[in-house]
C-alpha cells in the first residue's frame, strides 16, 4: 500500500504523519492522531457526526481524503473549550452523545458566523447533523443559546 507524509496543524499543533494514500481525514484523526472525539456515524457524509473545521470551514471528515488536509489547519471537538460544550449540555442538547461532536463543531462555526442565520433558519442550518435521540428541540435550543450568548 502506498503511503505519503501528511503535515497539517491540528488544534493549533503542527503534526506530520505517514498515512496510506487512500486514508480519510476521519481515520487519520481518530487512529493516527488519537482525536477520538470525532465520530464515524454513517461514513457517507449524511449524519455530521464526523464534522471538523478544515481551514475554518465545517466539513464531514469521512468524505475528505487525508491528502486534502496537507498544509491545512484542522480543528476537532477536542479543541473546543469545555465551557462551550457545557452550554450545549446544559440545555439537554444530547442524550447518547454519538452526534454531539459534530453538533459542537457546527455550532462552533456558527457562533463565529452568525450572519448565516440571516440567510437560513437555525433548524435548516443544523439539518446536516442528525440526532436519533432528541427530536432536535434540545439541539436547536442549545445551539441557539451558544450562538446568541444566552445562558
Say what each PLM segment does.
Residues 1-151:
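Signature of N-terminal electron-transfer/Fe-S-associated modules in redox systems
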